[in-house]
Design a protein with these regions (language model features):
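Extracellular/virion structural assembly segments
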Residues: 1-222
Length: 222
């Protein structure tokens, strides 16, 4: 049973990509806050349905238990019919236009995109809206857009796209240099995760079994 199978059968998915921070309140009632870690993705997945206790599922369950916390897998939130809205694209470009965009450069939490190969962009187009998912095509990491990006923002065939965290360099991305790569958008984006916590399972009448709690998947940063 793969992690993707768990996600595909989810009843609910809780998503947390907030940066880790701390807060202390002094005896003089002065509040101090500090960032303690980067914004990585955490998914808390509940699976409410029952599974048939057959040879196939029993074998997959055993595989799932053996993975523990050490096995990394790639997942998406939109593989199952009816879930595409979770990572849906809110801009107005079509798939061909998005496929013609390349990454020109990056700095901090900003991707600079090359639109020189894109045809048919209208001045009224929204390239990306807040919350859109974007992933360099050769990268492990997915980012979320934090500011609307319009066609009118394009200057000399380049446009800046602010995202929710700093762009990971090649040294933290398996040696992949994202400059010159294309982009994956919305439902084409993926996450590399490990299962930090997995529930036990309970056998039910009728040759069925259910999971007793939620799965917690955490993004793996190299």
């Amino acid at each position: 049973m793969s992690y993707q199978t768990i996600v595909n059968n989810a009843t609910t998915i809780q998503i947390n990509n907030k940066p880790i921070s701390s807060a202390t309140l002094s005896r003089s009632n002065r509040l101090k806050t500090a960032l303690r870690g980067e914004a990585i993705y955490r998914f808390n997945v509940a699976v409410g349905r029952a599974f048939e206790w057959n040879a196939t599922n029993r074998a997959m369950l055993q595989i799932l238990q053996q993975k523990g916390r050490t096995v990394e897998e790639e997942i998406t939130l939109s593989q199952t019919s009816g879930m595409s809205y979770i990572m849906g694209y809110a801009g107005t470009l079509d798939s061909t236009q998005l496929g013609d965009i390349d990454i020109a450069s990056y700095t901090g939490a900003t991707l600079t995109l090359d639109t020189s190969n894109v045809t048919g962009i209208d001045p009224a187009d929204t390239l990306f809206d807040v919350g859109d998912y974007i992933q360099p095509a050769n990268s492990r990491y997915t980012y979320e857009v934090t500011t609307p990006v319009f066609a009118t923002d394009i200057t000399l065939n380049e446009v800046d796209v602010p995202v929710h965290r700093n762009i990971y360099p090649a040294s933290s991305d398996g040696g992949n240099n994202i400059v010159g790569a294309g982009i994956n958008v919305a439902n084409n984006c993926t996450f590399h995760v490990k299962c930090l916590s997995a529930p036990t399972h309970t056998l039910q009448p009728g040759k069925l079994f259910t999971f007793d709690g939620n799965f917690e998947f955490v993004e793996v940063i190299l």
